[in-house]
Amino acid sequence: MEQEVRELMVEQIKDTFSAEKQALRCMQKAVRKASTPALRDGIQMHIEQTQVQIERVEQIMESLKVRPGRKVCEAMRGLVEEAQHEIEEHEKGPVLDLVIVAGMQRIEHYEIAAYGTNIAIARALGEQEAVGLLSETLEEEKQTDLKLTEVTEQYIMAAALEGGSGETARRGSQARSKAS
């Protein structure tokens, strides 16, 4: 039974590696579309952080004597595709920034769940080095999620409600006018 759990850990770590690589590519595209400086800065910081997180996952794979192979995290693929599709639906501006935050937070929440599971499995198997590396990344993912919420509340939301961009903003202001 322990061997099955160890194999599960290997598959989960490979999945996490794929997820981080996909998230990194998504962020690299999103940072170019963001218009709020605090959001751009936050995404850029998390891009750099994600590169380190990928290195940590590589360290874990090395300690487990496995390679990532061709494993693709299908859940992350779906989250990234959805985020990219939604980003393409909006013009640059505060509403697009909200869309970027929404997509990034869905990705962060997936990563938080994945790292939590990975930590539990690694801990049960006595893989303390992996537990330490995974825990460090989990904390960073939680902090990124909080920062995204903070940037939204402090900078993006008011601008989106005031003007927004494109058709989405016009529909929102028409709805507010009718409600008045």
Where does each model-flagged region fall?
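Amphipathic alpha-helical hairpins
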Residues: M1-S180
